[in-house]
Amino acid sequence: MRVLVKLSGEALSGEGGRGFDPERVNYIVNEIKSAIEEGFKIGIVVGAGNLFRGVELKNLTMTRADQIGLLGTVMNSVYLKDIFERSGLKARIYSQIVNLPDVERVNYDSIESALRENSILIFAGGTSNPFFTTDTAAVLRAQEMRAKLVVKATKVDGVYDKDPKKFPDAKKIPHLTFSEAMKMGLKVMDAEAFALCKKLGITVKVINFFEPGTLLKALKGEDVGSTVVPD
């Protein structure tokens, strides 16, 4: 089974942190390694919130601020590749925005070859264009690696009808469609990512990635998190 895991940059630094937290990064490696050992084919899209905050770039023109964010995802991807390989895993980085020794251009034959080798695919540089989020990039790259599942790795155990941090009476919604999520105004993903999921028939699973073992449970179809399906 092929799956694309969407990680926030904050996953690498810890909440409110900057840069890289070795303990958090080792946790990520172990969770991904467990999935690889069970035979799952893994792709990753990572954000850059551990390196750049939106508020820090607010005085720049939007296109240039987005370019800085895209480059941040490349930095995170190179970091992850090194850590994965030091842990005995194979990993390859694909991007359309840079030419670095460790970064390959997106090539479908190369992607298939890497998956046969059980390499982790790390997709850097978002969609390569400004104005698109890493959520949209995750769906696009899932399609390119022929995965029909995107796991959004968050610190919340699923989708709620309102923010559970602000509202103690928030109710978890274990299963819903993209149309329902959009109608309810739920911020699971941005509208462009939702639309692409609907068009491509890709399912999104929202989990609390930082509950040990939850990723593997989600991949095995166990009842964790929330599942958002095409209509």
From Swiss-Prot:
Pathway: Pyrimidine metabolism; CTP biosynthesis via de novo pathway; UDP from UMP (UMPK route): step 1/1. UMP binds at D66, T127, S128, N129, P130, F131, F132, T133, T134. One of its GO terms (molecular function) is ATP binding. Pfam families: AA_kinase. It is an enzyme of class 2 (transferase). It is found in: Cytoplasm. Disulfide bonds: none annotated. It comes from the Bacteria. It catalyses: UMP + ATP = UDP + ADP. Homohexamer. This is Uridylate kinase. It comes from Thermotoga maritima (strain ATCC 43589 / DSM 3109 / JCM 10099 / NBRC 100826 / MSB8).
